A protein has these predicted regions:
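Conserved ABC ATPase "signature" region
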Residues: 67-68, 104, 108, 115-133
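Short coil-to-helix segment of the ABC ATPase nucleotide-binding domain corresponding to the Q-loop/switch region
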Residues: 97-105
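Conserved ABC transporter NBD signature motif
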Residues: 60-68
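Conserved ABC ATPase signature
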Residues: 136-141, 145-146
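Helix-to-loop junction immediately C-terminal to a conserved catalytic motif
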Residues: 52
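A short, flexible loop at the N-terminus of ABC-type nucleotide-binding domains that lies
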Residues: 1, 10-23, 73
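ABC ATPase NBD coupling module
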Residues: 69-85, 114, 118
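Walker A (P-loop) phosphate-binding loop of ABC-type ATPase nucleotide-binding domains
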Residues: 38-42
Length: 147
């Protein structure tokens, strides 16, 4: 579950302050599927950066599963991120690796065993309809398939 309570995020510029988020209050239940839409500069990326703990709010509190992210220790951040699923606008795929290798690489860097990777990659690809494309390179996929 995700909760924002009176969240503000401002960025300091040379002589000014840019307000990215202003008094955001939202509750997203576990398993709820959410789209974040808005014009350029509306704060969509900032919202996600706060959830992923890439940035901290200027004011307010962000909670993930009841944990106050403004109080979490930096060493615990990677463990919390592993529990999240985010579809990025830029796909962050390694162009010289196959679809299978890209997914396996993401699992390998989180210390998942080779045996579990061999089981989980085909399963994960089947969930998104890409089991028949696991040997293809990213540039052989459509934009939606890359996401």
């Amino acid at each position: 579950m995700i909760d924002f309570e009176h969240v503000y995020k401002t960025y300091e510029t040379h002589n000014d302050e840019n307000v990215a988020l202003e008094d955001i209050n939202i509750h997203i239940d576990e398993g709820e599927f959410v789209f974040i839409l808005g014009h350029s500069g509306a704060g969509k990326s900032t919202f996600l950066k706060l959830i992923q703990m890439e940035e901290k709010p200027t004011e307010g509190k962000v909670f993930i599963n009841g944990q106050d992210l403004t109080r979490i220790k930096r060493r615990k951040v990677p463990y919390l991120r592993r529990q999240m699923g985010v579809v990025f606008q830029d796909f962050r795929l390694i162009p010289t690796m196959t679809v299978y290798e890209n997914v396996a690489f993401a699992m390998r860097v989180t210390n998942i065993s080779t045996k579990k990777i061999k089981d989980r990659v085909p399963f994960a690809l089947s969930l998104v309809g890409l089991e028949d494309k696991m040997d293809r390179l990213p540039d052989e996929l459509s934009g939606g398939e890359q996401q």
